Amino acid sequence: MEKIARIIVGCLLAAGVSMSSCQKADAVRGGEGKSGIKATSAVQPEPAKAGAIMRLKKYSLIDSQGTGGEAFSLLIPVDWHFEGGVTWVLDNPTMPATARFAVTNPAGYEGLEVFPNQALFWTNNRMLLGMFPIGSRYFGAEVHPVLGPEEALSAIVLPRMKAKQPGIKVIGSKSLPELAKALKAGAPQSGVQTFGQAAKVRIEYMNMAGVAMEEDIFAVVEGFSYPIQTMQGVITNTNWYVDYIFSFKAPKGKLDQNAPLFKAMTDSFRVNPGWFNAYNQVIDMLVKAQLRQIRSMGELSRYISQTNNEISDSMMRSYNERQKVYDRIGEKVSESIRGTEHYYNPIEASEVELPGGYQYVWTNPSGEYILTDSPGYNPNVESNKNWQEIRKK
């Protein structure tokens, strides 16, 4: 059960990433490998331009289709657009929800996109394949031979998730074993043979505005195989997933230099423990109902209404472990990135990582942040939100 929940929620949260313009434009944190892949250079924070202000805000995604409450939150530039959300799926009780969303800069072309997990199934049982050929769905999972992560990115992710973008050229790919290890993809499980690998590809294309773009797309392939005794002998079934699928993009030549803000946004991602609790209980109920298919959103709502708001100790431990995984995503994806700095927020009594290069950082009780290099700037002059200046750790 935990394995299934981890895979689903993992994509949702690994996806809590974004990319911003490399320029120190108005941006607040707040209330609401193989050749061809460029290595991100480790650079120290550059001083911000005089008078520059970065404003970031915390965006909360409401799961309007399911729980009705916050699913997760993440840090995004205050003037960027968020589109998408969580979709509850009716044909797969073991993966009842997926997420797809994009956060984009309307004044430029930078952005992040999170893609839905892909649940797949394969077997060497020829009789079963005769009834469920490649491309069909078997208990909500697509029947498809197992692929490695780089193959899956090229054969599954790009054709399905970037189908509307013509002229895509893959300019490089890279295996990411440390990312797979950090996510515990392929961790041993009793009674099954597990596997897990991660990779990224970099693509180039011309967007609709005629701007040359670069985009890095990440994914993990993981799954488990198990033997089954039949009258024809022992056959092997495999449930596998392409998950943690997300990308960040920028105009060509600016992708790597956007990394510090991307890392800060990734590290700011937080899943709501109440949503995590309800989601896992829904999976548990559906599996206990012998994989009974939900036939309507009304029926799904009734399932969700039966969840217990009280979070058990075991569920909280599971939640905390999941959050640690999401933190490791930021570490591994951007392990060579510098340009972020750590601050202590006395209001929240917590540490926060923000883009570097700014001399002054302010926060308020709503959890918003303003970064500036202007010594004379005081947000309290133009606001009644009780801004307080915070210091580097």
Predicted regions and their residues:
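Bacterial N-terminal signal peptides that target proteins for export
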Residues: 1-9
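C-terminal motif of bacterial Sec signal peptides marking the signal peptidase cleavage site
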Residues: 19-21
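Short, low-complexity, disordered segments immediately C-terminal to signal peptides
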Residues: 23-44
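Short aromatic-glycine motifs in intrinsically disordered, low-complexity regions
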Residues: 60-75, 252-263
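Proline-anchored loop/turn motifs at beta-strand termini and strand-loop-strand connectors
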Residues: 69-88, 265-273
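Surface-exposed amphipathic alpha-helical segments
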Residues: 80, 244-288, 379, 386-389
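Conserved polar/disulfide-associated segments of primarily extracytoplasmic proteins
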Residues: 86-240, 250, 299, 303-313, ...
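Charged, amphipathic alpha-helical linkers/stalks
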Residues: 279-308
